[in-house]
């Protein structure tokens, strides 16, 4: 899923949902678990 893409650095530069660094794999999990969190 998204973790794999992040691991490859494809979605790393753009993590607007979490606002975390490129090493954060929470891009997908955060988005699914709490999409309205605003992080």
UniProtKB/Swiss-Prot annotation:
<protein>
    <recommendedName>
        <fullName>Beta-glucosidase 2</fullName>
        <ecNumber>3.2.1.21</ecNumber>
    </recommendedName>
</protein>
<dbReference type="GO" id="GO:0008422">
    <property type="term" value="F:beta-glucosidase activity"/>
</dbReference>
<dbReference type="GO" id="GO:0030245">
    <property type="term" value="P:cellulose catabolic process"/>
</dbReference>
<keyword id="KW-0119">Carbohydrate metabolism</keyword>
<keyword id="KW-0378">Hydrolase</keyword>
<feature type="region of interest" description="Disordered">
    <location>
        <begin position="1"/>
        <end position="39"/>
    </location>
</feature>
<keyword id="KW-0326">Glycosidase</keyword>
<keyword id="KW-0136">Cellulose degradation</keyword>
<keyword id="KW-0624">Polysaccharide degradation</keyword>
